Amino acid sequence: RQEAETPEPSEPTVMEAYKKTTEVNPLNPYRFCADPTSVEYEGRLYVYGTNDQQEFDATGGLTSNTYGKIRSLVMMSTEDLVNWTYHGTIDMTTVCGQWLNASWAPSIVSREEADGKTHFYLYFSNSGGGVGVITSTSPLGPWTDPLGKNLISGSTPGLGLCSTPFDPGVVIDNDGSG
């Protein structure tokens, strides 16, 4: 009996322009979504992640990814963890402007504020040089930049030896403080 040879993986075809079929995201097969975070709102789970789309160029060729040019976050949601809706990306350059270097590893929380509305706070690593935050009263935006700068930077008191804060993890305590 002769064993069949396993063919070598090939470069993506035009139909696989953004990702190889062996490199799929189970939630969204044509989009990378690293470092996911999620929040539940009105029976729907909203997931946000680092948008690694530039790992392949427009023709499907591999490119070098230094992560320094990631300036958008991916959004998707589900009601049943089976069927997913892709909501596009948050263009962080448009929201944050000139102070943004890159946006990685988001972390989201929501809470009802004094105005009676649920507010969403989406924190992100700004290229390892700090942690920024954008806000919205909807899990899908529009998003605004309330500070115009990093919330936490390497010079923030109390960081000790952590001169490059990144990959935030945000929680809200039972008393409502965060």
How would you label these PLM feature ranges?
Residues E3-G178:
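Carbohydrate-active catalytic/glycan-binding domains of CAZyme proteins
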